């Protein structure tokens, strides 16, 4: 997984948020992506820990730890490090049908649970996830899937979480 010495060689890097006054004039992302080389370095920081708590999605002493939808984070970090973006998307879609939504609203408990976070700064998992799905849309790997036929039926959706978005 990743580069065995990646967590030693590379520091945690996160994109710099756009200034609020700059964001007022448009609907563009306020968390821009790192360039590909730097994203791959962040993927290399994933250290193939023995027990990757980042994707456990467990409650420990009543507190959430790791990814609540059990994304296989070390695997797609490794694929990004190796430049295998399409495969990283496939791995991400194994557990998450809506990374373009959930990845943006998630508070990233995976980063808090990252084993590297014990003695150093955690891997920038959230920024890697954003880059995977945004690249997938840009490359045409993800396309809208409208219903094949209209049934004429109506559905009431309660809530705006992942289940509501899937309805």
Name each model feature, range by range.
Residues 1-154:
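Ferredoxin-type iron-sulfur electron-transfer modules and their immediate structural context
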Residues 153-167:
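N-terminal Rossmann-like FAD-binding beta1-loop-alpha1 element of flavoenzymes
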């Amino acid at each position: 997984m990743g580069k065995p010495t990646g967590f030693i060689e590379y520091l945690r890097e996160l994109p710099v948020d756009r200034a609020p006054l700059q964001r007022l004039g448009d609907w563009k992302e306020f968390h821009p992506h790192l360039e590909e080389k730097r994203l791959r370095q962040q993927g290399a920081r994933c250290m193939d820990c023995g027990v990757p708590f980042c994707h456990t999605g467990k409650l420990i002493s009543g507190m959430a730890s790791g990814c609540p939808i059990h994304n296989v984070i070390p695997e797609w970090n490794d694929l990004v490090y190796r430049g295998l973006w399409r495969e990283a998307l496939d791995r991400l879609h194994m557990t998450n049908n809506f990374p373009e939504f959930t990845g943006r609203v998630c508070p990233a408990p995976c980063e808090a649970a990252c084993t590297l976070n014990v003695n150093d700064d955690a891997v920038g998992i959230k920024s890697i996830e954003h880059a995977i799905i945004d690249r997938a849309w840009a490359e045409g790997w993800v396309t809208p899937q409208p219903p094949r036929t209209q049934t004429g039926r109506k559905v009431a959706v309660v809530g705006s979480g992942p289940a509501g978005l899937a309805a």
